A protein has these predicted regions:
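An amphipathic, hydrophobic-aromatic interaction surface with interspersed Lys/Arg
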Residues: 1-58, 65, 127-215
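A generic structural signal for solvent-exposed, polar alpha-helical segments
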Residues: 18, 29, 69-72, 236
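Phosphate/adenylate-binding glycine loop and adjacent helical scaffold
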Residues: 48-53, 73-82, 122, 126
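Intrinsic-disorder-associated interaction segments
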Residues: 57, 79-80, 118-126, 219-224, ...
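Extended, charge-biased low-complexity segments
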Residues: 57-96
């Protein structure tokens, strides 16, 4: 079972109802939209895809040891570490605390360890913890490795699918949810990041479903495939890791 499957199995209710997750006595709360900028900035240190870094030693080492290596280098060169500060901020945001105690060290077996508010976390547990935080807050996060060339293809395919248009800035996304749901701005600002994006995605699917359905029923357009209801799980072309740009173009008749 992958970490993703394990997280969704063990914490399905917490993820669904935005409840805090208890991991080894550490309470992890879903981050609200009002703190999205700080969260995205601070969580950047736990979102690095180090497997794509062209260095065999980095690829082989655990994520926790990788962070410790960066922290040591920064302290040696600058006297302080931005990586350490961002890591601490990320934990404080997720745990909703104002102060935190973090100790990093290498044990007698050469393994990296983290003591977070008196809770000892080993290398495997840290990898699970960071992915738990990311799955709890980012609905489109996926820790599966993708071939770099295919990853580039998928990014291009995503642009094609969206007509080459950029997504509106965050302020406009908030306004869209206010208009589309009837919630006031304060309600939206208090939404967890995960729910904010899921609601936006469902609204978008509902709108397109209505347009396509009306066009089909009215005889304006004939679709090759039946129109899938917006609440049914749709197998997105981009979710298929073997989809290429050319395949997507053909499927979309571009």
């Amino acid at each position: 079972m992958s970490i993703k499957e394990e997280i969704y199995k063990n914490y399905y209710e917490e993820l669904t109802f935005d409840d805090p997750i208890d991991y080894k006595g550490l309470l992890l709360y879903p981050v609200s939209i009002r703190k999205i900028n700080k969260f995205l900035q601070s969580s950047s240190v736990i979102r690095i895809q180090k497997e794509y870094i062209p260095d065999k030693e980095i690829i082989k080492m655990s994520y926790l040891k990788f962070l410790m290596t960066n922290i040591d280098k920064e302290k040696e060169e600058y006297g302080e570490s931005l990586t350490f500060d961002l890591l601490a901020l990320c934990f404080m945001i997720c745990m909703r605390i104002e102060e935190i105690s973090i100790r990093l060290f290498i044990d007698e077996d050469g393994k990296a360890k983290l003591i977070l508010n008196d809770v000892e976390i080993d290398e495997n547990e840290f990898d699970y913890l960071r992915k738990l935080i990311l799955y709890q807050n980012l609905p489109n996060y996926d820790d599966e490795l993708i071939n770099p060339d295919l990853k580039n293809d998928l990014e291009q395919a995503d642009k094609i699918k969206n007509g080459g248009e950029e997504t509106e800035d965050f302020e406009h996304l908030i306004a869209n949810l206010v208009i589309g749901t009837g919630m006031n701005i304060d309600d939206v600002k208090n939404l967890p990041i995960r729910k904010f994006y899921i609601i936006g995605q469902v609204m978008d699917r509902k709108l397109h479903y209505s347009i396509y359905k009306q066009a089909s029923v009215g005889g304006f357009v004939e679709f090759k495939q039946p129109i899938t209801h917006y609440l049914k799980k749709n197998i997105d072309l981009l979710e298929n890791k073997v989809t290429t740009v050319e395949t997507l173009k053909n499927n979309l008749n571009i």
